[in-house]
């Protein structure tokens, strides 16, 4: 379905981003992988995996909080992969603390990584997508882009911001063949979430399985993790012709979290 298209997926060396990149490559899209601090061995393994899928693949270590590094990654995608047809803004970090104890530098880092980076990247690719008459901007938001949780002020602010930014991008691209949508996952067993599970294990002195169940029970009625593969499947749908008139939307994939 996506043969001949090229996708940049930020934060795609693991977790949700890798799941999305695999799903897009499975439909024939060339992939620009991105990670920060990945080892040469990890990069080589990823390139081998994607090349075996029959698509072109490149890797760029851009720090998504640095506009000049994102610009260099976009230039590399044009030079090595033929352009940018799909942009998936996925890179994110988390920090948990009450507002009155939240370190300012941590706030700045979360906003820069989770929100500002999407603006930096989108502004670099939007004009070319409009000129081409086809493009997909997919922002990985969160259930926390729609509802809040205590202790996550920066993350919630950033993810609410991503949903709003998605809508503005959709309005400014309406009628051009470019769409902009957000995916709002609930709990996904990524390295980011595993850290929160580890914290519960340490605090409560319970097993990993018990901590996982406790985490899920607090928010996610299905009591099952969303998988990166499921999120990748939704991203593929949003790139399809069937989704050509879906824009400015925020799709929950959260086991019923925000239905409560």
Show which residues each predicted segment covers.
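C-terminal substrate-recognition "lid" of short-chain dehydrogenase/reductases
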Residues: 81, 119-120, 126, 130, ...
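Substrate-binding pocket helix/loop in short-chain dehydrogenase/reductase
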Residues: 98-99, 103-111, 216
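Residue(s) in the substrate-gating loop at a strand-loop-helix junction
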Residues: 142
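Short, small/polar-rich loop/turn modules that mediate ligand/substrate recognition or access, typified
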Residues: 174, 179, 246-248
């Amino acid at each position: 379905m996506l043969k001949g298209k090229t996708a940049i997926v930020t934060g795609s060396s693991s977790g949700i981003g890798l799941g999305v990149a695999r799903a897009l490559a499975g439909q024939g899209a060339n992939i620009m992988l991105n990670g920060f601090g990945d080892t040469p061995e990890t990069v080589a393994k990823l390139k081998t995996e994607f090349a075996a899928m029959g698509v072109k693949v490149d890797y760029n270590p851009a720090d998504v909080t640095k506009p000049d590094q994102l610009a260099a990654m976009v230039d590399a995608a044009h030079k090595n992969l033929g352009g940018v047809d799909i942009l998936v803004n996925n890179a994110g970090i988390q920090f948990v603390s009450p507002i009155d104890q939240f370190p300012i530098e941590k706030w700045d880092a979360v906003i820069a990584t989770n929100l500002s980076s999407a603006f930096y990247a989108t502004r670099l690719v939007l004009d070319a997508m409009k000129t081409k008459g086809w493009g997909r901007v997919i922002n990985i938001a969160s259930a926390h882009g729609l509802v809040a949780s205590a202790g996550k002020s920066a993350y919630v602010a950033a993810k609410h911001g991503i949903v709003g930014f998605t809508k503005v991008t959709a309005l400014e691209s309406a009628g051009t063949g470019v769409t902009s949508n957000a995916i709002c996952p609930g709990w996904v067993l990524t390295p980011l979430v595993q850290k929160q599970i580890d914290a519960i294990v340490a605090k409560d002195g319970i097993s990993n399985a018990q901590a996982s169940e406790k985490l899920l029970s607090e928010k996610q009625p299905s009591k099952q993790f969303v998988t990166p593969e499921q999120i990748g499947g939704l991203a593929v749908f949003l790139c399809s012709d069937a989704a050509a008139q879906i824009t400015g939307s925020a799709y929950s994939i959260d086991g019923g979290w925000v239905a409560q």
